[in-house]
Amino acid sequence: MSGGHQLQLAVLWPWLLMATLHAGFGHTGRVLAAAVESERSAEQKAVIRVIPLKMDPTGKLNLTLEGVFAGVAEVTPAEGKLMQSHPLYLCNASDDDNLEPGFISIVKLESPRRAPRPCLSLASKARMAGERGANAVLFDITEDRSAAEQLQQPLGLTKPVVLIWGSDAAKLMEFVYKNRKAYVWIELKEPPAGANYDVWILLTVVGTVFVIILASVLRIRCRPHHSRPDPLQQRTARAISQLATRRYQAGCRRARAEWPDSGSSCSSTPVCAICLEEFSEGQELRVISCLHEFHRTCVDPWLYQHRTCPLCMFNIVEGDSFSQAPAASPSYQEPGRRLHLIRQHPGHAHYHLPSAYLLGPSRTSVARTPRPRPFLPSQEPSMGSRHQRLPRTSHLRAPEEQQHLAVSPHPYAQGWGLNRLRCTSQHPAACPVALRRARPHESSGSGESYCTERSGYLADGPASDSSSGPCHGSSSDSVVNCTDVSLQGIHGSSSTFRSSLSSDFDPLVYCSPEGDLQGKGIQPSVTSRPRSLDSVVPRGETQVSSHIHYHRHRHHHYKRQFQWHGRKPGPETGIPQSMPAASHTQLEPSLPDQQLITPNPTASSMLPNPQRPRALTEPAPGLAEASSPSPSPKPNPSGLLNLQKSSLTVRHPHRKRRGGPSEPLPTSLPPDLTVHTACPVFPHYSPRLAYPWPPEVHPLMFRPPGPDRRLLHEVPGPCYSSSQPVWLYLNPCQPLGPCLPGEGHSKWTFDSPEGRRCPYSHCQVLPAQPGSEEELEELCEQAV
């Protein structure tokens, strides 16, 4: 039954009770009323005792009669000798009879039919009797009952008037008729003692019950309606009661050891984030499940109202931690999203992570789903329908493909410090990269845990001065790269030129979701450097480039300590017109003719602008693989010596320049490019290759052993693909092999400790082309 029905019943049931009492005690009520009326009349009754003057030893002649006092006279007791009087006697005013006063006169009234016209009224006769010396008058109204009404009108007579009728009147008249002398006492009849008590007791009980019922009704109606306690409030109170509390102690190190990710910091005095007051000795602190500490008096009201941590929004009721929330909505992993981080120092990206991200991955080999980093996504302005990109996820390899990947380490790979690099993929999206969580020493000490990753890109801004030469980052960042500022990182546009600086993500920030390795026994050991998302185009995508409007930063220092042999073909440089702006990988013409002339319509159809030559280009990722006549081609030793790299990276004493991959021109591609080279592996998806940056942004730099040798993780595998721009130190050396007619020898080789030359397509250099340093500087300035 609802509360409204209960209230209505509470209001109505007193009235129902009263009706029940009236129905049950109706007869009793009427009897009670009659009793009260009789008691009222009883007070007017008189007791008439008649005692004969002659003593009767038996007492049978003694009479006790009842009568009623008339209203015309006073109700008082009286006594005297009994004397009969005729009605007509009382009409005579003469005093012929000398009667002794003090007698009781009895008058028997006749029927009104016999005396229609009485001489005097009954009241007058009663006065007349009193005047003649009677102490009281007794009227027998047996034959005239109307006399009672006549005698009820009060006239103020001093002598009492008593009315008798019936049997009592007959007994008295019989005594008179026998001429017996008697003495009469008229007394007031006392009412019974218990009658009034019973009535008042009943009235008291009924009144008490009624009062109790009325009080109950008023209490129910006037009581405030308190709603049931909210279950969520109960859960919140229970969760707050289960939170830990502690007394603050000045020893910061011990406190930090107990709470590694607490809101306090050893670098400064801990402060309550709510009241902004420093913790003092002995204060009671509330420690939330996320290990943030506040004054108990400050945070408890907040927790009761919001149920979340004021800093990290950890829900104390639901238990949704900071690391679990992004897993449900990894919207920032979608294409066209930009990640916003706090940039506090040049060359570093600082982002806030919970303690779970600082503990490192599990040592087990069980594969888990990647946990993304908690950042705020925003839509990239330049992303359109034709810029949709496939999610960069790892793909499992079929067992039959893995059988062709077990090759021995190549000696050249060993010379580069990659003696454990293995060929694990033939698809650009097939090899996930080992991960690394933030090192504890890279976290800040401002009270929260911040992971400092090397961003690899330093834009012009208040915190950086690119005109001062090398980048001035923090002392711990030894690999900060100085590059031109790309407007694609701010506005975004579309063109056919692809650069490693154009990315779906913020150019100032490199970050990505973390996940465990999918290989067996693979454990991350070094940090991961972010890669540009435009540096690699997956195989299944349309190779649509993003236009890069390079801002001419004249203040950038382009040193002239390196050489560039040739900038464009034509009569000025002496290069044949058939050669492209940047040479592509060529194989020795010893393969079958049908392989040399096999067209590649897929690769050609994906080139948006084949008429525009590029200064820095390299083969598209899918050319060699799409044109391969066999699933696992064998390398050509003689052709490997003549492979040439299309993107040349030079050694600069102060900064390292970037080169972006671009699509080759179908009109200028030599037929040798259609031949499947040896082991076309795409390194940024290899599960055996671990870069010091998260997998979302893979390395833009791949360097041999040197000052930054720590950035490269040595993993097995002899192969490396040309689908990713590679940055290497180059030194003048002898050409790798015989040159074709009209081509000069390459004067650049890799700066490896052993002096080995890389035989693969991504490691080769451009052919020697004439050109001056001024042209090279102009080329670098325009970046076209």
From Swiss-Prot:
Disulfides per UniProt: 91-119
SUPFAM superfamilies for this protein: RING/U-box (SSF57850)
Pathway: Protein modification; protein ubiquitination
Compartments, as annotated in UniProt: Cell membrane; Endoplasmic reticulum membrane; Nucleus envelope
Compositionally biased region (Polar residues): 583-608
EC number: 2.3.2.27
Keyword Acetylation: no
Expression sites (tissue/organ): Expressed in crypt base columnar cells of small intestinal epithelium. Crypt base columnar cells are small cycling cells residing between the terminally differentiated Paneth cells at crypt bottoms. Colocalizes with Lgr5-positive stem cells.
Span list, region Disordered: 364-407, 459-478, 516-671
Principal location listed in the UniProt entry: membrane
Annotated keywords: Cell membrane, Developmental protein, Disulfide bond, Endoplasmic reticulum, Glycoprotein, Membrane, Metal-binding, Nucleus, Signal, Transferase, Transmembrane, Transmembrane helix, Ubl conjugation, Ubl conjugation pathway, Wnt signaling pathway, Zinc, Zinc-finger
Gene deletion effect: Conditional knockout mice lacking both Rnf43 and Znrf3 in intestine show a marked expansion of the proliferative compartment, resembling the effects of acute deletion of Apc.
Catalytic activity field: S-ubiquitinyl-[E2 ubiquitin-conjugating enzyme]-L-cysteine + [acceptor protein]-L-lysine = [E2 ubiquitin-conjugating enzyme]-L-cysteine + N(6)-ubiquitinyl-[acceptor protein]-L-lysine
Gene3D superfamilies attached to this UniProt entry: 3.50.30.30, Zinc/RING finger domain, C3HC4 (zinc finger) (3.30.40.10)
Residues in compartment: Cytoplasmic: 219-784
Extracellular side stretches: 24-197
PROSITE patterns the UniProt entry points to: ZF_RING_2 (PS50089)
Glycosylation sites recorded in the entry for this protein: 62, 92
Function: E3 ubiquitin-protein ligase that acts as a negative regulator of the Wnt signaling pathway by mediating the ubiquitination, endocytosis and subsequent degradation of Wnt receptor complex components Frizzled. Acts on both canonical and non-canonical Wnt signaling pathway. Along with RSPO2 and ZNRF3, constitutes a master switch that governs limb specification.
Subunit organization: Interacts with AKAP8L, NONO and SFPQ. Interacts with FZD5. Identified in a complex composed of RNF43, LGR5 and RSPO1. Interacts with RSPO2. Interacts with LMBR1L.
Name of this protein: E3 ubiquitin-protein ligase RNF43
